């Protein structure tokens, strides 16, 4: 099925952001694990898998619309050098993705591509959950202090 070029462009923009986020979460997971924060590292690792599945969904949709998934135009990774920076960098990236998702949803709606819109809406819901989790981590650090937060982050299941 030949898709609308504007929708395909928006899907590719979101795909690029997801690909960056996959790498960012994965690297942060490994950094945190290396620092001894097993539980927190595991959360970020699982998050990278969630992002990978979302990217796969976009790739399949772009191909279905007879577009070419663009896996080459990648943005900049935001890599934190402390736990607080890691959380802040990932929150910034998730907020960037949120803005792109809203634009893509509006384009899909305007072009009457309701399947793409629904896919993007689902990804927006997941994105908002990620934003909420990251904001909660920042609030926890503010309330209980970084040393106490890191103590809980180091625990293994």
UniProtKB/Swiss-Prot annotation:
What InterPro entries does this protein map onto? Bacterioferritin, Ferritin-like, Ferritin-like_diiron, Ferritin-like_SF, Ferritin_DPS_dom
What's any GO biological process attached to this entry? iron ion transport
Co-factor(s):
heme b
Claim: Metal-binding is one of the keywords in the record = yes
Keyword field: Heme, Iron, Iron storage, Metal-binding
Question: SUPFAM superfamilies given for it?
Answer: Ferritin-like
Ferritin-like diiron domain span: 1-145
Q: Name one GO cellular component term.
A: cytosol
Positions binding heme b in this chain are 52
- Select a single GO molecular function from the record's annotations and give it: ferric iron binding
Write out the residues that bind Fe cation.
51, 94, 130
Q: Which Pfam families match?
A: Ferritin
Q: How is the cofactor bound?
A: Binds 1 heme b (iron(II)-protoporphyrin IX) group per dimer.
Q: Does the keyword Metal-binding apply?
A: yes
**Quaternary structure?**
Heterooligomer of 24 subunits, arranged as 12 dimers, that are packed together to form an approximately spherical molecule with a central cavity, in which large amounts of iron can be deposited.
NCBIfam families xrefs: bfr
Q: What is the annotated role of this protein in its UniProt record?
A: Iron-storage protein, plays a role in protection against oxidative stress.
Q: Which family does it belong to?
A: Belongs to the bacterioferritin family.
Name used for this protein in its record: Bacterioferritin B
Species assigned in the record: Neisseria meningitidis serogroup B (strain ATCC BAA-335 / MC58)
Q: What is the lineage of its organism?
A: Bacteria, Pseudomonadati, Pseudomonadota, Betaproteobacteria, Neisseriales
Q: Which gene encodes it?
A: bfrB
């Amino acid at each position: 099925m030949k898709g609308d070029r504007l929708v395909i462009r928006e899907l590719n923009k979101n795909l690029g952001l997801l690909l960056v986020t996959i790498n960012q979460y994965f690297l942060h997971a490994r950094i945190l694990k290396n620092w001894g924060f097993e539980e927190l590292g595991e959360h970020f690792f699982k998050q990278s898998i969630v992002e990978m599945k979302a990217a796969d969904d976009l790739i399949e949709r772009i191909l279905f619309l007879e577009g070419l998934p663009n896996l080459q135009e990648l943005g900049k990774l935001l890599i934190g050098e402390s736990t607080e920076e890691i959380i802040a960098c990932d929150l910034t990236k998730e907020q960037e993705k949120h803005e792109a998702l809203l634009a893509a949803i509006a384009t899909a709606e305007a072009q009457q591509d309701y399947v793409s819109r629904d896919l993007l809406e689902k990804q927006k819901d997941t994105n908002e959950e990620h934003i909420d989790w990251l904001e909660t981590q920042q609030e926890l650090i503010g309330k209980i202090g970084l040393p106490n937060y890191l103590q809980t982050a180091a625990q293994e299941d």
